């Protein structure tokens, strides 16, 4: 039986380079651009959009990471769902994908890469996405992901800026994948880890399609930089603040217990160090800081929508099979911090 996680020191989106380090690098590089570029490197948008004409914009994104689970097939499913997520976060429809592979040759020979690809293809078929090719290298640590191209109508792009005072904040997936992935390595809290694996394997397609029937002022997906990191980007980009209610957060079973046991990935501490425009967590139990800064892999969409539409949106999400969707807070006038946690 092949187990992938022993080959990776950090798994899933927890293996990202820290936001403060990456930001310093990106600020020192001048990236080519032109008038067709609607979104790109600036503004912390989830994907780039290149406008072809008034009706069609190309959405492009790339995502790859190290194993977050032991089973190769499941890893492929999770990696594919995660790679497609940024297109859904822009309100787009993914069309094509290219495989990105780095794998130890012994694992390839043992059939692990075959199973990873089979899992990814199952998810891509579910999404209606075709694969046009890919690239592979030999690597000591297994990595897999996809470069994805999609399309969106340029005047209907969802951005992570645009949240308005009075909007409700709706989150479509439960939090705690980093904590539960750490618990998984110790064979602990099987109910919670199974729920987390199912959530990570689930496409954000249904959430995106349901939300398109409502007024979306801003959207982002919650991944490696945590609810606080991605929430902070939405707040600062929109010149507002977010109020998050811990009692309203959707959580996987046993996440609180696992965090209390110290089953917290190292990237949580990196997020906490880098993301400082947050208020209120010091007054709460430390477990809430661990959850709010937990790096998510293939996390849900965070949507800022008019309060008047929120109840119907959540109902529509539930009917679409997005059962974890909840209102977790609201958008308020700009204060001293990006995010206030209650």
How does the language model describe each region?
Residues 13, 49, 83, 91, ...:
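Buried hydrophobic positions in well-ordered alpha/beta secondary-structure cores of metabolic enzymes
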Residues 73, 191-199, 217-218, 288-293:
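Short pre-catalytic strand/loop immediately N-terminal to key active-site residues, enriched for Gly-Thr
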Residues 37-39, 47-50, 85-88, 121, ...:
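A generic local secondary-structure boundary/capping motif
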Residues 1-89, 164-170, 174, 317, ...:
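N-terminal glycine-rich phosphate/pyrophosphate-binding loops that anchor nucleotide-derived ligands
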Residues 147-157, 191-212, 284-285:
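Active-site glycine-rich loop that binds ribose-phosphate moieties when present
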Residues 1-10, 21-24, 105-130, 139-142, ...:
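Glycine-/charge-enriched secondary-structure boundary and capping motifs
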Residues 72-98, 115-126, 203-215, 225-234, ...:
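Small-aliphatic-rich amphipathic alpha-helix that forms the alpha element of a beta-alpha
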Residues 52-69, 74, 93-189, 329-330:
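Glycine-rich anion-binding loops of enzyme active sites
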């Amino acid at each position: 039986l092949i187990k992938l996680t022993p080959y990776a020191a950090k798994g899933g989106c927890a293996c990202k380079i820290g936001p403060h380090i990456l930001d310093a690098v990106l600020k020192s590089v001048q990236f080519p651009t032109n008038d067709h570029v609607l979104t790109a490197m600036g503004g912390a948008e989830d994907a780039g959009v290149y406008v072809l004409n008034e009706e069609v914009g190309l959405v492009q994104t790339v995502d790859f990471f190290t194993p977050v689970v032991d089973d190769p097939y499941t890893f492929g499913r999770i990696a594919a769902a995660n790679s497609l997520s940024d297109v859904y976060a822009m309100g787009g429809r993914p069309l094509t994908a290219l495989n990105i592979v780095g794998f130890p040759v012994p694992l390839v020979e043992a059939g692990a890469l075959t199973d990873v690809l089979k899992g990814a293809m199952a998810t891509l078929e579910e999404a209606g996405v075709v694969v046009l090719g890919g690239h592979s290298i030999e690597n000591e640590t297994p990595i897999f992901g996809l470069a994805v191209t999609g399309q969106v109508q340029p005047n209907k792009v969802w951005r992570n800026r645009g949240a308005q005072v009075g909007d409700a904040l709706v989150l479509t997936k439960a939090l705690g994948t980093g904590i539960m992935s750490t618990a998984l390595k110790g064979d602990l809290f099987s109910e919670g880890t199974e729920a987390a694996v199912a959530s990570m394997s689930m496409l954000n397609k249904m959430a995106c399609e349901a939300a398109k029937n409502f007024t979306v002022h801003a959207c982002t997906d919650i991944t490696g930089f945590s609810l606080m990191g991605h929430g902070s980007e939405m707040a600062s980009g929109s010149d507002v603040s977010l109020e998050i209610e811990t009692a309203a957060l959707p959580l996987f079973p046993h996440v609180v217990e696992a965090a209390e046991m110290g089953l917290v990935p190292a990237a949580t501490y990196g997020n906490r160090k880098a993301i400082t425009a947050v208020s209120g967590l010091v007054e709460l139990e430390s477990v809430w800081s661990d959850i709010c800064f937990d790096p998510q892999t293939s996390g849900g969409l965070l949507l800022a929508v008019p309060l008047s539409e929120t109840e119907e949106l959540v109902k529509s999400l539930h009917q679409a099979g997005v059962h974890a969707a909840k209102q977790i807070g609201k958008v308020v006038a700009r204060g001293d911090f990006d995010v206030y946690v209650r």
